[in-house]
Amino acid sequence: MTIHAIRIGFSLAALSLLAACSGGDGDGGPSTFGGFNPPPTSQLVTITESNAPAIAGVAAEQIIEDSLISTLTTTGIPVVGAGSLAASDMVRLSGGSLVPGTAAATLPTQDCAVSGTVDITFDVNNPETISLGDEFAFEFDACNDGAGATISGGLGMTVTGFNGDPGSDQFFLQLRLELSAFTVTQDGMTAGAEGIVNISIDSRQPPVTTISVSSSAFTVTHGGMSETVFDLDITIVEDQSVFPTAVSVDTSFRLSSPRLGGDIIVATSIALESFGEEYPYDGEFTITGDASASVTVIALGGDSVRLEIDLDGDGSPDVTVDTTWTEVMAQADAA
């Protein structure tokens, strides 16, 4: 799974599942879940020649593979289309009228397709369309919608920006998502998420779609391990005028992970470029640890990648390692 496959999967996959669980009646509800208290950050990790490849792998997977950003897709939940399609579905549902003549309500508990339930509340300005300030909330209780996943926990959505036609694929949509004790179980694996995320999707200039995600703190639990991303800012640009789809990713964040024994700061200096399911063929990002030591990861094309390791923090590489994305990702798995 690479950039093109995952994008901002956790939230948009959730949106598509919400639509399925709501039975098409509509979506809704104020975001009124409990406050999120992220764990304090630890010290920046010490980067050495021996641990640099694993650190590079953990950072790389946040951007291009089984990332924190998309962790709810790693249990097999499908991402719908180009990522923006699931949000488009929500727009269409809203355009089709949530509950005619009703601007605020708590719907009767909805049965999910296979088992479990979902409670839906909403407070909207105009039930006939989506508009600024609309609020939706979903509380899932072991909801199995028939896609093989079971969802529990809360998801609140507030529309913070919208422009376009709800009946078309060309729109600008900005959402604030709040996840509380949100879990997805599939094939015996459970992933959880908690935090607040801001998302914007701009598909007004087809065939290009721009997706931006930001969060001050967001925690994911998977395989019994919790990781937190702080100060996340990521922009993904997809161009479907070519096949496979051309994807560009620009990002910065701080990651706190028990796999690292500390924190790392990650930022792209040149946007990562890829086609379809391939690894990035161009771009670079730098991982900074304690005492300004760093690892710069440079895409060389195909499966090739270079690690420039600055051990003393003087801005010049002390060690250069030419390796592969496959090996870098294997290092992350072993961390």
Kindly label every feature range from the protein language model.
Residues 1-10:
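Bacterial N-terminal signal peptides that target proteins for export
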Residues 17-20:
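C-terminal motif of bacterial Sec signal peptides marking the signal peptidase cleavage site
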Residues 22-26:
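Bacterial signal peptide processing site
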Residues 27-335:
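Low-complexity, intrinsically disordered segments exposed to solvent
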